Amino acid sequence: MYKRQVQHTEPDHSGGFKKVYAKYPNAKVYASISGKKNMIEQYFDQVPYQVVKTNDTINTGKYDFVFVEMQMIHWPDNMLTYCPQLKTVFSNDAFGQHIVNFNLTDEGLDKAYCLKQAKEYFANIVLPYTTPVQAKLNLILGMNLDIEYIMPAHGIIWKDYIADIIETYKGIAAQKVENKAVIVYESVWKHTQQIAENLAEGFSDAGMDVKVYKLSDTKSSIVMREIMDAKVVCIGSGTYNNVMAPSVAAFLEHIRPCKFKNKKGLAFAAYGWFNQVAKEIDTRMQQSGIESCHDVINQCYTPSDDQLEDYFNVAKEIAKKCQE
């Protein structure tokens, strides 16, 4: 009998199931309990499903496949599979990236580039689930698997940099931070931009690595990657019809499920007659786990030289707090 594994039921993973089913209608389908439910909801209920859980093994005649449930990395149905004969981990979404390489593996690719791409993927797909990632990573490492290849569902196959990607995952799953400040903002008349630029100068003067992004000019995936390991996050907006800029509101919604740890935050805004936007930004930053470390900055119209110096010093003060 033919056997099929369904590691994940999101359509980019399972979308070809109908074609496979048409050719092998009697093949048994192995899936997690959530995977079975999702497959029935999306495709067929008459398929011979078999639910598997961690450490269950199937044999295809030539190969054994050991299953590991990977709930909430990043759906409830996710599974990882290990083949001892091939010394290969089929890791599903874990360890994924969006790298295209004709050699299929990481051979010949710059290590820093590969890890950077993996971080960007993690930040935008898996970041809200660092706690289960950490738990499952410890479980898998505790199984002492002999691994020569890690084959994620997205991107290149890990071969040369397996130890490096595992160490990278350990760090980001533990939400380790670097001595870095990330400032994101939206501005039309440059009032908010001036605040951002002077904060950046203050952080830099205090010895921190600084990244500054205007949201309308930057892919949010890049901003997410940089925020992931930042010690300080500053978010600012101009005031538009008594609310924050739509790009800032969307970004705050993007980070809300992340539940960050080990991050200090500062909210800032420019306004003309309604000065509540910075407070709203601060509230939403705290909802994402970013701890407020200074009073919000409210700037009425154009900042003076003295005010810009104040913002420079605010950044230095925050940087100092982060070293204590």
Language-model features, listed with the residues they occupy:
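Short, charged N-terminal beta->alpha structural module
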Residues: V184-D205
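FMN-binding flavodoxin-like domain, especially the glycine-rich phosphate-binding loop
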Residues: N101-L104, D110-I150, H154-I157, K176, ...
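Short, small-residue-biased leader/transition segments that mark boundaries at the very start
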Residues: M1-Y2
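Catalytic core of the metallo-beta-lactamase
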Residues: F44-G108
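Metal-dependent catalytic neighborhoods of phosphoester/phosphodiester hydrolases
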Residues: G15-K23
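Short internal beta-strands
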Residues: V6, N26-S34
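Divalent metal-coordination and catalytic microenvironments
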Residues: H8-E10, T81, D93, V133, ...
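Residue-level marker for buried hydrophobic side chains located in beta-strands
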Residues: Q5, T88-F90, M151
